[in-house]
Every structure is written in C-alpha cells, then in structure tokens.
C-alpha cells in the first residue's frame, strides 16, 4: 500500500510546481466561481435499457427558444466522467437557432447515474452497443450528430464498426444517407493507447501504477476509495496537471473535475482498463468517409496526446483537424469557446446538407406530381 501511495505521490509531485504557480496567481477572479458546473436542469430524464438490461441514465435538452429541432446531438462522455462533463456544450448549444438542436446526454454503464455492470461487460464493444440502444430509443428518426470525448470517441468508432449503415452514404447502402450526419472526435485515439511511436499514455494496461491500483481495488476496494477521498491537495494537484493544460485554470473547474472523478467507484473504473489495451479501430475510420467529421484535441493533452488526433484525421482524409493550443485532455471544459465554435460549424454543415437533401426530395416529388397531373 505504501508503494501505491508513493506512486500516486510521484505523479502528483511533478505537478507541485504548476500548482504553486497557480496558487500564486490565485488572487485573480475565478471566471467560473458562479457557474453552475454540471448542475443545469435537463428538460427531461429517462432510462434506456441496454441489450443486457443495464439501465442507462439519459438527459434531454430542448432548444432554448422552444423551436422545432432539426438535428439530435448525442454526447458520449469519457472514461471516469459522466454526462455532466458536457456542461458548456449543453449550455451553449441549447441557444442555437441555426440550426436548432435537441441534445441527448447519457451516462455510460458503471458511470454516473447509470447502473453498475458486470466487469466482463466493461468493454468498448459493449459501450458501442449501449450507444446504439440510446440512438434507437432517443432518436429513432431524423439526422444525428455524435460528440465523443476520449473513451466516448472510441465508442463512436466501434459503433461505426458494428453498424456502418448508420454512417454510410446512399452510394454505399442504397437506402439514402446514414442517420449519423456528423461526428466530433474530441481528445481521443483510434489505436491502442500505449502503441509504439506515440507518447506513452497513462490510460494503459501496461502502466504499473494503474495495475497496482486495480489489484488493490479488487482486494480492498474500501481502502482505495478512502485513500482517494483523503488525498486532498495531493489529488487535486495531480488532477489539475493531468486534465488541463499549462495556462490559468479556474479552481472551480478543477473542483468540478474532482467531483466528476469521485462519482465512479475505483473498482468500476479498473474493469475498463483492459479494453483500452485492446483498442485498435483504425479500420473503422473509413466508415466516416461520407460523414462530416471534426477531430479536436489540445496539444498539451497528456492522456491522449495530439499525435493520436493527427493520425485519426489523416486516416479519415476529409476530417477537419482542430488543434487547441495549450489545452489538456478536458479541452471541452478548459476551452469551451474554441470547442463549441467548431461544434457549431459542424452542426451548420450538417444542417445545410440536410436542407439541400430535403430540397432535392421536394423538387423531385413536385416533378412527379406534375407528371401525373398532366
């Protein structure tokens, strides 16, 4: 146990200088001191049953002006987080009028307010099946745009592998355009997170500290939870360094990250580690060739370094690669203006294509009606 705590300390010690520097600048006003981070009330909540019966918590947000939505946006959150991590996207996209969007955010199994699942089902394959269940239940018709952060992005890739018909164009499936018109892959990876040629990631089954925590969580889960809760400033410094970039970070954001991380049991988190080690979904990226794709990542991301996003964009070909300078892994929390402006561009592209498609269909129907009434 002392070795484990020492290992955690070693990670956090590297953050000490950064934390002290932030502390010296702490006199400046916290821009999010009064922001209700993660506490925006949804318009509706519900539960979707996964294919194995696991209950998945779902929150819906309608357009703020009460107008009719043109697109359904589904947010797929990252490892150890919850739907609450989409706070700024949920807030800002609700105000959109061009296009109006209906937002759907859900918690992965064994995360947040969703049901706990068997460790054997803690796989990206199962998460993709869960996402498919959410789409069927919450967006049975109409265009969809998927937002995937970190493990959520991996889940979207696996969905493309399991159900390519959701993404493929009329030329491929013969039944009209796929339901998924756009995808945002945020701070994620398509290949195994510890693969050669890219920076070694902490989200790796090869990391000895991760394995140590996993073994201890299985042997004495209450002890691990206690150590995590009692970590205090040590844990806060580590989270500050690993989740965010090197710039001025709102203390409220760091507190919010800690709150998110503490919402999922260590035992549940550790059960997902092997699926990261097995993650290799570059072949699935070809399915996005006829989908609008935005690949967004901070170049100070320590968990899924920017090289991963570069490779994803290169493999897709037509994807837009967005480099957010100085931002870390939680780029959508740290730099919401940069991320949201790109998401709005993506949504507007998808809406324009949908408008053109409907116009073509309407024109065709009009010509047919004229032919029959001659």
Predicted features, each with a name:
Residues 3-47:
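An N-terminal hydrophobic leader/cap segment in hydrolases
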Residues 102-167, 171-176, 341:
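Active-site loop/oxyanion-hole signature of alpha/beta-hydrolase fold enzymes
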Residues 314-374:
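Catalytic active-site module of serine/aspartate enzymes centered on a nucleophile-bearing elbow/loop
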Residues 54-116, 154:
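Conserved HGGG/HGGXW glycine-rich cap/lid loop of the alpha/beta-hydrolase fold
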Residues 218-287:
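Conserved alpha/beta-hydrolase catalytic His-Asp/Glu region
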